[in-house]
């Protein structure tokens, strides 16, 4: 039997980050919270494990899922702002740094096409970095 894959969105919140499951036909839902993205994902994983245990204790069938984490654009930009300048991200993604600033501060939302452009640029940059070897 194939496991369902569920999208889990990671977003910046007032006190850190939150992770939540996309609308699903499941009988349960999980969330995670933390001061960092890493803490948030770890908290989500704990919540998923606790949900599985709860179902086992109550004798209810638990539908195992596979989940993938997705950033919203503003949260990604906020998380990595200390590592990348907007000018640097413009060179990597091809998206104007003024627009990136609007996305970072929530003044505008990028179109789906722009989100894909940002994601493709970041992934290409990551591939380039992972291929490097230092002498």
Map each language-model feature to its residues.
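Short, charged, surface-exposed hinge/linker loops at domain edges
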Residues: 2-5, 45-98, 102-115, 120, ...
